[in-house]
Structures are given as structure tokens and as C-alpha cells.
């Protein structure tokens, strides 16, 4: 993940060969099957996990919104803005986009546990990122309501066993993980947001690595030498214009370490290739929560790359602790976070950069994996009181959606503030 050179902590890609996870106890969460609803809400359930009040039924794709005042779920009255409302709702829940939308009639489809309707203020709709800000209770005389299907994400398509100990991960366990290769060598990790967009770290693309024809994205395999993985060319790289080391090579500021890779053509989604979810709007990190980081990086600080994808479970550390004098001494900025163990021993390392830090949650009734962090930097690998540092993805939701919207036809290296 990072090197310490001349007293300065720098991203792992400052060296030509980089790759996955520090050796140590490796664990895997069990896969969870599909359930009836995709839910995100600001309610509290028995596990005290914050939820956001928007649901999409897997039965008939009806969109439902929770009425906090009445304690009931309401349908969303159909309008001329159905396409925009569907897109906004899916994005708010952490999906990349709405795939389709339609109208249903409550007289034929039934209320199915809902009570009444919300209507959208279409005049205010273009100026908000949150559905709750532009809806109010209404009668909806026609009784027609909105249904939508969001791009699926954050779910495995194969049953997987629980792994305890230091074994390699298995095919289909982390289907959003990709390898970014330059001249055929693994350089960084990345996470699929869709068939043609990958989220990774900006520092993977210094000046010396900007010939896009030499980049390939490798997906659908856990072994670097696998003949069964798919390799696709890169059309464009969109990096954050606020990543200071690209403007000043002497800068030690690692904020805004985020980039999007647009593939030349979409990857086919299979059991081994699937997108990960983004955090829902307003979803906060939970200090102490144990999540998973994956990659092909070095298994020791001065070790070799891992030939097979590795995984490690590490807890999120509060920024107050990580900014302490014994840790990183105020180097952790608001759009970063730390994860690891104070005693060290399990961490991301060189070559994991840009790869996923994912957390499973139940903010939808179908548990999903969300991309909460991007492997960014650190001091050494698995050192005591020097945990891995990650880009906080929740703080870049708007940047991600705007970059995809703006640069879908771009080619080459592109910057986006």
C-alpha cells in the first residue's frame, strides 16, 4: 500500500512492481442469498444499523418510501418525471443507475402493505440529490405508482464457503475485484462499478504510466496466471483534479486519491464478474466494524506479489485514534480513514493500491457488499500503529456520478474536480 522512503510516506505505486495483502489470518464472511427487498432507511433496526427510507420490491419493483411521521410505507405516485425519480432513487440507495422504470396500478397490483402515496415536486427535482427533500403526501387520484429496477450490485452469484486461516480466496468470492496491468504486470487493484467503469486510486497513474494503450483491466479470475480471466483495453482514466501529488511531486498530501477507469467495451457480467455497491447517500462508516480488503499485493513488506487473490478482515479505526501521536499524527484528513489492528500483523501492502475495502451491511433486506474504501497509502505494511489508510468513498459519491456522466465519451487522461 505504501512505502517509507527518506522519511516520507508515499503510495505504493512509486515503485515499479507492486501487488495484494500482508500474510496473517484471512477470513471470509459467508455469502447471503437474495431476499425480498432492497432497502435503505434512516430507521433503526434491531442491530441498530441506520437505514434510509427507500425500498424497491424484488417482487414487482415497486418503489416505496417510508413516512416517518405516520410510521408507514407509501407508494410514489407516477409523474412525468418517472425516469428522473427512478434514477435518483437508485443512486441514493447506492446503485449506480436505474435500468428500467414503469407504472403499476394499485387497483390491480395491490397495496401490499403500503398506505397511501407520496408525490414528487417536479420543479424542485432537478436541484436535489435526496428524494425525501422533494416529496409530500398526496391523494394520487389515478392510483398509478412508480416501479423501477436498479442495476444489481454487491451480491455474489455463487455459494461460497467460509474461510478461516491463511488460504487463498476462491473464484466468485469477490467478483468486483479487478487487476490493473501495465505492460502485462499487475500494478494496482480496482473495483467494478458496472461492466465498463472501474473505481481505483489516482496514484496508480503517475506520469510514467499514462500511455493508456499499455494498460489492461483483468477480471473474472483470482490467479494472476489464469488463462480464463478477461482482459480489456482502457478508453479513459478520469482522476481527481484535487490530488496534489500530480500537481506538485513534492507534496505529501494524499487527499482525493481516487480515479475512474472507463473500459473500451463492457465486461460481460457473470458469476465471476459483478459490480460492487457504493455507500448509500448519507451512510456513515462505523468505527470498529470489521470489513474486508482484497488484492494481489505483496504478502510481506519486502516480499513478492501474491499469485492468487488474497483477503483480510480488518476493523475500521476512528480518525481520532488514527490521528494520534502514536499513529499518524494528524495526517489523516476528513476524506480518509484507517483500518487495521493497533498491533499490526494484517494489512494491505504494495500492489493492493486502488483495490476494494468492502463492508457487508443490511441496509437492504438483501445483504450487500458496499465499496467503503479504496486502498490508498500507509507506512510499511502491517506495522504496529501504522494501519492502512483508505480513501473514504462515501465522500466522493457526487464526484463519481458526475465524472461518469461527464466523461462517458472521453478518451485519454482526463481530470475532474
From Swiss-Prot:
Residues 163-405 form the Peptidase S1 domain. Residues 45-417 are extracellular. Residues 1-23 are cytoplasmic. GO terms for biological process: basement membrane disassembly; cochlea morphogenesis; detection of mechanical stimulus involved in sensory perception of sound; negative regulation of apoptotic process; negative regulation of epithelial cell proliferation; negative regulation of epithelial to mesenchymal transition; pilomotor reflex; positive regulation by host of viral transcription. One of its GO terms (cellular component) is endoplasmic reticulum membrane. It is an enzyme of class 3 (hydrolase). The keyword Transit peptide does not apply. Disulfide bonds join 77-140, 90-150, 119-138, 153-277, 188-204, 291-359, 322-338, 349-381. It comes from the Eukaryota. The keyword Ribosomal protein does not apply. SUPFAM superfamilies: SRCR-like, Trypsin-like serine proteases. Its main location: membrane. PROSITE patterns: TRYPSIN_DOM (PS50240), TRYPSIN_HIS (PS00134), TRYPSIN_SER (PS00135). GO terms for molecular function: serine-type endopeptidase activity; serine-type exopeptidase activity; serine-type peptidase activity. The chain crosses the membrane at residues 24-44. Its EC number is 3.4.21.106. Keywords: Disulfide bond, Glycoprotein, Hydrolase, Membrane, Protease, Serine protease, Signal-anchor, Transmembrane, Transmembrane helix. It catalyses: Cleavage after basic amino-acid residues, with Arg strongly preferred to Lys. Residues 54-151 form the SRCR domain. It is a single-pass type II membrane protein. The active site is at residues 203, 257, 353. Plays an essential role in cell growth and maintenance of cell morphology. May mediate the activating cleavage of HGF and MST1/HGFL. Plays a role in the proteolytic processing of ACE2. PANTHER family: ACROSIN-RELATED (PTHR24252), HYALIN (PTHR24252:SF7). Belongs to the peptidase S1 family. This is Serine protease hepsin. It comes from Pongo abelii (Sumatran orangutan). The gene is HPN.
Amino acid at each position: 500500500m505504501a512505502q517509507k522512503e527518506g522519511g516520507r510516506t508515499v503510495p505504493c505505486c512509486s515503485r515499479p512492481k507492486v501487488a495484494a495483502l500482508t500474510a496473517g489470518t484471512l477470513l471470509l464472511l459467508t455469502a447471503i442469498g437474495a431476499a425480498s427487498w432492497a432497502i435503505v432507511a434512516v430507521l433503526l433496526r434491531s442491530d441498530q444499523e441506520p437505514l434510509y427510507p427507500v425500498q424497491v420490491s424484488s417482487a414487482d419493483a415497486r418503489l416505496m418510501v417510508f413516512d416517518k411521521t405516520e410510521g408507514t410505507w407509501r407508494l410514489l405516485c407516477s409523474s412525468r418525471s418517472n425516469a428522473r425519480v427512478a434514477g435518483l432513487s437508485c443512486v441514493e440507495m447506492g446503485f449506480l443507475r436505474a435500468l428500467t422504470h414503469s407504472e403499476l396500478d394499485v387497483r390491480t397490483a395491490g397495496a401490499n402493505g403500503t398506505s397511501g402515496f407520496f408525490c414528487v415536486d417536479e420543479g424542485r427535482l432537478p436541484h436535489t440529490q435526496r428524494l425525501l427533500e422533494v416529496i409530500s403526501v398526496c391523494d394520487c387520484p389515478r392510483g398509478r405508482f412508480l416501479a423501477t429496477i436498479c442495476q444489481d450490485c454487491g451480491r455474489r452469484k455463487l455459494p461460497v464457503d467460509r474461510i478461516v486461516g491463511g488460504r487463498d480466496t476462491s473464484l466468485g468470492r469477490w467478483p468486483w475485484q479487478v487487476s490493473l496491468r501495465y505492460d502485462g504486470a499487475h500494478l494496482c487493484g480496482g473495483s467494478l462499478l458496472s461492466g465498463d467503469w472501474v473505481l481505483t486510486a489516482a496514484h496508480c497513474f503517475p506520469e510514467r504510466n499514462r500511455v493508456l494503450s499499455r494498460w489492461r483491466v483483468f477480471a473474472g479470475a483470482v490467479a494472476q496466471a489464469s488463462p480464463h480471466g478477461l482482459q480489456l483495453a482502457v478508453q479513459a482514466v478520469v482522476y481527481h483534479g484535487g490530488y496534489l501529488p500530480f500537481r506538485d511531486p513534492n507534496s505529501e498530501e494524499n487527499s482525493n486519491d481516487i480515479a475512474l477507469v472507463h473500459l473500451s467495451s463492457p465486461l460481460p457480467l457473470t458469476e465471476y464478474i459483478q459490480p460492487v455497491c457504493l455507500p448509500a447517500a448519507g451512510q456513515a462508516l462505523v468505527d470498529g466494524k470489521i470489513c474486508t480488503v482484497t488484492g494481489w499485493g505483496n504478502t510481506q513488506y519486502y516480499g513478492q506479489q501474491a499469485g492468487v487473490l488474497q483477503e483480510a478482515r480488518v476493523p475500521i479505526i476512528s480518525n481520532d485514534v488514527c490521528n494520534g501521536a502514536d499513529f499518524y499524527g494528524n495526517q489523516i484528513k476528513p476524506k480518509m480513514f484507517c483500518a487495521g489492528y493497533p498491533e499490526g500483523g494484517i494489512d494491505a501492502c504494495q500492489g493492493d493500491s486502488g483495490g476494494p475495502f468492502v463492508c457487508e451491511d443490511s441496509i437492504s433486506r438483501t445483504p450487500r457488499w458496499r465499496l467503503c474504501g479504496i486502498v490508498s497509502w500507509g507506512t510499511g505494511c502491517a506495522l504496529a500503529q501504522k494501519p492502512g489508510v483508505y480513501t473514504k468513498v462515501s465522500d466522493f459519491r457526487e464526484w463519481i456520478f458526475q465524472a461518469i456522466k461527464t466523461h462517458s465519451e472521453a478518451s485519454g487522461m482526463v481530470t475532474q474536480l
